[in-house]
């Protein structure tokens, strides 16, 4: 059995004009095996429309954008990664997990991308 670590920050604080938006991600850790389906959720403390992005970060590497604006796959990202949701509830799904997917995954709220 080859476990994959899927770790996310539980709270991300993002300043906004209407006050701070808190993103709560779960689970904070998940051990799974290849070929499994993995679901990671992100909940915003107030509605953010579709301004939610998902990133993958591997050790000693910069974060890689996977999904932009809740459900739009970024160029070159494998089709097993998908995103959904709007308003306050969002989901990142990895279908048929591969060993190379072992990483930290996190959500980020922003109306624009860097």
From Swiss-Prot:
Annotated ranges, domain Ig-like: 20-114
Region span, Framework-1: 20-42
Cell compartment(s), UniProt: Secreted; Cell membrane
Keyword terms of this UniProt record: Adaptive immunity, Cell membrane, Disulfide bond, Immunity, Immunoglobulin, Immunoglobulin domain, Membrane, Secreted, Signal
Pfam families, sorted: V-set
Annotated stretches, region: Framework-3: 76-107
Single GO BP term: immune response
Region (Complementarity-determining-1): 43-53
Residues spanning the signal sequence: 1-19
GO cellular component: extracellular region; immunoglobulin complex; plasma membrane
Entry annotated with the keyword Secreted: yes
Spans annotated as Complementarity-determining-3: 108-114
Region (Framework-2), start-end ranges: 54-68
S-S pairs: 42-107
Ranges for region Complementarity-determining-2: 69-75
Main location: secreted
Domain of life: Eukaryota
Family annotation (InterPro entries): Ig-like_dom (IPR007110), Ig-like_dom_sf (IPR036179), Ig-like_fold (IPR013783), Ig_sub (IPR003599), Ig_V-set (IPR013106), IgV_Light_Chain (IPR050150)
S-adenosyl-L-methionine found in the keyword field: no
Function in brief: V region of the variable domain of immunoglobulin light chains that participates in the antigen recognition. Immunoglobulins, also known as antibodies, are membrane-bound or secreted glycoproteins produced by B lymphocytes. In the recognition phase of humoral immunity, the membrane-bound immunoglobulins serve as receptors which, upon binding of a specific antigen, trigger the clonal expansion and differentiation of B lymphocytes into immunoglobulins-secreting plasma cells.
Quaternary structure (record): Immunoglobulins are composed of two identical heavy chains and two identical light chains; disulfide-linked.
Name listed for the protein in its UniProt record: Immunoglobulin kappa variable 6-21
């Amino acid at each position: 059995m080859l476990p994959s670590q899927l770790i996310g920050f539980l709270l991300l604080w993002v300043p906004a004009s209407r006050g701070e938006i808190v993103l709560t991600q779960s689970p904070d850790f998940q051990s799974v095996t290849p070929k499994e389906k993995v679901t990671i959720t992100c909940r915003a403390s107030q509605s953010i429309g579709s301004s939610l992005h998902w990133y993958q970060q591997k050790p000693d590497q910069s974060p890689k954008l996977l999904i932009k604006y809740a459900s739009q796959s970024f160029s070159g990202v494998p089709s097993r990664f998908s995103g959904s949701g709007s308003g306050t509830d969002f989901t990142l799904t990895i279908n048929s997990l591969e060993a190379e997917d072992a990483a930290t995954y996190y959500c980020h709220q922003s109306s624009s991308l860097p």
